[in-house]
Structure formats: C-alpha cells, structure tokens
Amino acid sequence: MYRPKSQRCHKPRDSLFSWSSGFDNFTGLVNWGFLLLTMGGIRLLLENFIKYGIRVDPEQWLIVLTGRHEGGADHPSLILLTYSVVPVVLCLLIEKGLSVEIISYAPGMIAHIINLLVLVMIPMVVIHVKPSGFSLIGATTVCMIYSILFLKLWSYIQVNLWCRNRRSSMSKSHLRRQSLSFHNKNESNSVPNGFVDHEEKNAEATLIHYPDNLNLKDIFYYILAPTLCYELNFPRTNRIRKRFLVKRILEVVVGFQVVMCLFQQWIIPSVKNSLIPFSNMDVAKATERLLKLAIPNHLVWLIFFYLMFHSFLNLVGELLHFADRNFYCDWWNANNIDTFWRSWNMPVHRWAVRHLYKPLVELGYGRMAASVAVFFVSAFFHEYLVSVPLRTYKTWAFMGMMGQIPLSMISKFMEKRYGPRWGNLVVWASLILGQPLCIMMYYHDYVITHIGEDLIDRYGHV
C-alpha cells in the first residue's frame, strides 16, 4: 500500500488574478480577445451587407474624384494646383534679392509675409466664390497642398534667414561654417539601405553653401521632398531600390481601393443614418451611431496612416533619393497625448519644434506658451483643411485640437496615478471616439447649411 512521506499538499499561495501573485502570462486571454474582436468585426460586416447590399461602385469614385456631379467642367482645382508654383518662385526671388542685399531686411520680410498670407487665402476665396466648380476631393487636395507649401516656405525663409545672420556674424576664418545644414559628418562610414557615405575628406567638396542654394533646382527638390524642414544639404541615398519601390507602389494602389470601398460600403451609410438622431439630440441613438461609426472610421484612419506615412512618403523618398525616412515613431505605445503628438507625424512635429516652439522659447516665452502656440497653429490648419472644402465654418476641428491641451493633462494624470497602460487607453479612446464625433457634427452642419432642414430626412437615410 502506497504511503507518501508527507500528506501536506498546501502552501501559502495567491490566486493568479491577484496582483501579489506575480503572474503575468495572459497570452491565452489575449488570443481570446482577438478572436472575439474578429468575430464581432465579421458580424458587423455581414450586417452591413445584409442591410445595404453591395454599395461599392468604382464608377462613383471617378465621379467624386473628378467633380463631374458638381458641374466642374473648368477644373479650378487643377488651375489652383498649377498656380501653386507662383508663390514658390516669388519666395525664391525675394530670397535672391535679400542674399545680394538688393532688398533690405524689412521690405523682404513684409513681402514674404504677404506672399504666405495670400497663399493661404487663395483657396478660401476661390472655393467660396466658385463653389460649384470644386469637388470635395479636389477642394481638399488644394487646401492640403497649399497648407504644405505654407509650412515648407516658412521653413525655407527661416533657414535662409539663419544663414544670412550667421554669414554676417562670421569674422574669423577658423569659425565653423554654420551655414551648412549637415549633421554629424564624422558618423559611421557603414550606411545601410544604399545611403551615401559622406566621408569627411570629401564633405567640403560636395556640400552646398549659402547662397549657392538659392536656385530653382534646390527649391523644387525641397518642395517635392517628403519633409517640411528645409536644409541646404539633405541626406541622400545612392540608388533606388526597385523591389522596395514596387512594394510601396502596390501598397498605395491597393490601399487606396480598400479605403474607397470602406468609405462607400460602411462609412457613408453610418454617417447618413446618424443625422436624424444627432439632429433630434437623441442621446442614446446618437451614441449608438457614434460607436457604430467609430469602428470603420478608425480602420480607415489606420489604413490612411500606413498609406501616407509609410507607403507614399517612402515612395516619394525613394524616387528622390531622400535618405531620412523617419516619418513616424511608435505612437501606438504613447502613454499620454503629448507623446502621441510627438510620435505619429514626425515631419509636422519636427517643423513645429524647429520653426515655432524653439524660436518662441528663445524669444523669452515660457514652454507652456510655446506649446499653446503650437497647438493653436495645428488647430488652425485642422480647421482649414475641413471647413474650407466643406464651406462650413463651425470650428469643431479647431476646438477639438485645442481640447488636446486639457486632454493631455488628463492623460498624464492617468499615467502617473494608474500607470502607463491607462494613459495609453486615454490616447486610444480619444482617437477612436473623437474623430467620428467630429464627422457626425460636420455632416449635420453641412446638411443644415447647404441643403436645408426641410430635406434632412432625405439625407438622413440610406
């Protein structure tokens, strides 16, 4: 007969779900959560097909993209895009005059300011005066391009100003040539992915010095380059990787089709069906519509992020031999709103820090005031990119961006009080719920403003 040496089978232990147990392997529960999420997504997709049928129609994409449904036979969007070359050339001519001192500092800066203000105002005036000629896509593209040009020319003007100031202050031959925008010439010689190896002995011969950079080739390379910050010497690659280029092209083409399908099949019906509950201030139904819209909208936003910041910008960078491909950081791990805004759009973040935040701090403004100024400029352009194409000036996007300041404080409090994971949850919640709420508000105001309350029932059903 079996008799164990000890009959004891218990010892002091905590349950696995207790914090004190030290157990942290929940891989099975994560798999369970992904499975439930997948099943829920498939159910929503089937519900959409059963309720609305197949709504994807590529012919409608062409109509929307060309603006044929709005009578745009004279293509004002193409005219404005062509005209965008004019302020670029004007900026170069002013800089040439400043470099040889034909134009003095004050008149030159006034000319630059007028040029930039006119650049921003032209789409607003033309779209308002001739609204029937613009498709929504065309107007949005024009506003986007003109906003990018505004930021690029601001950087171009400021960097050349720094170069002029440094040139005038250099009195000793042994001073470092600070007019060169070249970082760390003595870095490692092994450069991956076809990057050019700038050896120190050849660097001086290949670098561009101010004012030799003031020419059409230089400024138009900068205008096309995937960056908002101007430098006299950008890091370059020495070859185009054909396989990498083909992958990015396929991603852009296929991803664009997926985004258009999701818009037509899922987002448009959800937005239209949210109009009446939102107008009647039916909180329960409006909340249900908000949550229903949140999933496809967030999916489109994620795809758009990948298409823009990975596929398209890498595609442009590869074609132009532009070597700095740091277009985004790990924003998905952001523990607070501040970290998110510093991570998800690196070209804009670098521009804001280099050309707005640091100059304001150097002028004696506090860090908080400089941060508010950055959010204010960002809020203005968010509103500009939404209100001008829609011709609906309600400032929802502006207030949403300015609302990031108190939301940032909340997320930092959650991070410090409850840990980084809760701060990250606040970031994701703001992304998932904030965007569809703005979409619903703008669609409601657009219908009321341009169509009228009498037809709200017609535009509130699919």
Descriptions of predicted regions:
Residues M1-A106, V462:
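N-terminal signal-anchor/initial transmembrane insertion module
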Residues D24-G40, H69-V88, S104-V120, G133-I148, ...:
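Transmembrane alpha-helices of multi-pass eukaryotic membrane proteins
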Residues L35-R55, Y83-S99, L119-P131, S147-V159, ...:
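Membrane-embedded alpha-helices of multi-pass membrane proteins, especially ion channels
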Residues G67-V253:
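Intramembrane catalytic core of multi-pass membrane enzymes that act on lipidic substrates
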Residues R167-S171, G400-I405:
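Aromatic/acidic cage segments in peptide-binding pockets
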Residues K201-E251, F256, N273-S387, R391, ...:
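Membrane-interfacial catalytic/cofactor-binding modules of polytopic membrane enzymes
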Residues M414-Y418:
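Membrane-interface junctions at the ends of membrane-embedded or membrane-associated helices
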